[in-house]
Every structure is written in C-alpha cells, then in structure tokens.
Amino acid sequence: MTAGHGVSHSEEGTGYRGQLHGVQLWVAQPDHTRHEAPAFEHRADLPQVELDLAVATVVIGEFAGVVSPARRDTDHAGIDLDLRPGRSTIPLRGDYEHGVVVLTGACTIDGADVTPGHLAYLGVGRDQITLTTDEPTRALLVGGVPFDEPVLMWWNYVARTRDEITTAHRDWTEEAARFGHVNSHLPRYEIGPPPWRPQ
C-alpha cells in the first residue's frame, strides 16, 4: 500500500482461526512522491533465492541479484528469511543501514543474541552477516540507503512538519476526500489532536 497524500484501509478477519504471523513496515516516501494519489498492489508470487541454509523471499527491493516486482520509491529492501538450523552467511549492501527482526525461533547475528520481536540494528558499512540458529527460525531483514529528509510521525500521519501533521489530522477528523472511504462494518477510528508542546 502506498499512502501518497493519504489513504484509509480496514484490517478485517477472514474467519481463519489458525495462527498467523504478520509484520507491518512503514517506509517514508520521498518528497517527490509523497503527495501523489494512494495506491495498492498485491504480489502473490515473490522471488526467492537460497543462501546456505536460508531461503530468502524478496518482498521489496533487490537482494542477492533477485528483484521484487513490488513498487518502491526509495532505495531499500525487505527480505523474509526462512532459516534452517545451522549457519548462513547473508550478503548485505555496504551503503545500506540494516536491521533484523526475529519473528519465530531464535538466532545470533555474528555471535550476538537477537531478542525475538525486537529490531537488531546493524548500521551502515557491512557487506555480510552470519546468522546461526539451533532451530527453524523466521526473520525479516530490512535495509536501505539512510533517508536524507526530515520525517515526523504522529499516530498514522507521516509528514515533514508539524503544520502538515496538524492539517492531516484536521482532514481526517473532517473526513476529507484525500483519505478516501472504506466500506467496512468496523467503526472509523477517531483520535484526538496532536499533543504538541509549545515551541
């Protein structure tokens, strides 16, 4: 989903009662695309590559010579790693800052334990990492060129200035057309004004 100047959506169950795992990532859009109309795309067949004991699904961006068809407005990547027990060397781009989130199982990165559900920040300048697991593990590798524009976020609003967030909140509260309309049995979420401190 690409928010552009604003988007609404509903997250509703399907009746499935098994266990689900999900990760929601927000990527700030660059100034030249953040005022465009919102968009949505569904990609059922994402490319994969095998590395040592890992199967890597390229959700977005490029990884190990494989390119996802998903839209991206900045130079970044998101890779779903399905790790079998053992050691896997994962290539990285040195100009990216990276992070790894362990979703299920457990692993170490270059010998350091990673707490499941937390982001292990790897910074810029690495060309590879070694992931070691004693059990089947699922992890998400994210990375990208450091963003060189200021970004503010409050609730679901992502902007560059307080004024933009205040305007977005007013438009949401007044149900302005910029956010669109969602036909859903769920109630529309209401939120109070931003708690700005005086400047």
What are the functions of these language-model segments?
Residues M1-Q199:
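Jelly-roll (double-stranded beta-helix
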